[in-house]
UniProtKB/Swiss-Prot annotation:
Primary localization class, coarse: mitochondrion
An example Gene Ontology biological process: mitochondrial translation
Source organism of the structure: Caenorhabditis elegans
Entry keyword set: Mitochondrion, Ribonucleoprotein, Ribosomal protein
Keyword Cell membrane found: no
Pfam families, A to Z: Ribosomal_L23
Entry's Gene Ontology molecular function annotations: structural constituent of ribosome
Gene3D superfamilies recorded: 3.30.70.330
Keyword Ribonucleoprotein among record annotations: yes
Assembly and oligomerization: Component of the mitochondrial ribosome large subunit (39S) which comprises a 16S rRNA and about 50 distinct proteins.
Recorded GO CC terms: mitochondrial large ribosomal subunit
Name of the gene this protein is made from: mrpl-23
Protein name, entry field: Large ribosomal subunit protein uL23m
Length: 159
């Protein structure tokens, strides 16, 4: 499915032409922990809404030579902007964002996907993490001074 058409006649020798589809795919980062995490061999894509499971499989196997085992798709409804959020009886929809199509692509068993690191960690972020760790340590030391103060029976009785 392409919007480009081949011309009937072109000057010169006949040439092979490849027409790629007008579809697009984008890798979506999924959480590595928690209930929404995906298996290691699964990749989450946001795809063109016109794409079918077969289109996604062919796109990844033919163009990128990936070992696709299974494709599952999901259509997520776009957010609706209401004129009045609290008035449930008379509210009207003012705007609706476009729906998204999400594809979960499962690769063969040995394949592992990790989301690429696009940017290096900033020094400010590293300093912030270091300060947070230091704050936790100080909090623990402060709590140790006050923990179980009323249970110093040994000191009280002279033992």
């Amino acid at each position: 499915m392409t919007s480009r058409l081949a011309r009937l006649w072109q000057p010169g020798n006949p040439q092979r032409r490849v027409f790629l589809p007008d579809f697009w795919m984008a890798v979506v980062e999924s959480p590595s922990v928690g209930r929404n995490r995906l298996p290691r061999n699964c990749v989450k894509f946001e795809v063109d809404p016109r794409m079918s499971r077969h289109d996604i499989r062919e796109y990844l196997t033919k163009i990128y030579d990936l070992p696709v085992r299974d494709v599952r798709t999901e259509v997520q409804m776009g957010d609706i902007t209401w004129n009045s959020k609290l008035d449930h009886q008379y509210k009207k929809a003012m705007w609706k964002d476009e729906d998204k199509k999400i594809a979960y692509v499962f690769m063969s068993k040995g394949f592992e996907f990790s989301y690429p690191q696009m940017f290096e960690a900033l020094e400010e972020d590293l300093e912030l993490v270091k300060a947070m760790k230091q704050q936790e340590e100080l909090k623990d030391k402060l709590n140790e001074r006050y923990a179980n103060r009323n249970r110093r029976v040994g000191q009280f009785l002279g033992a």
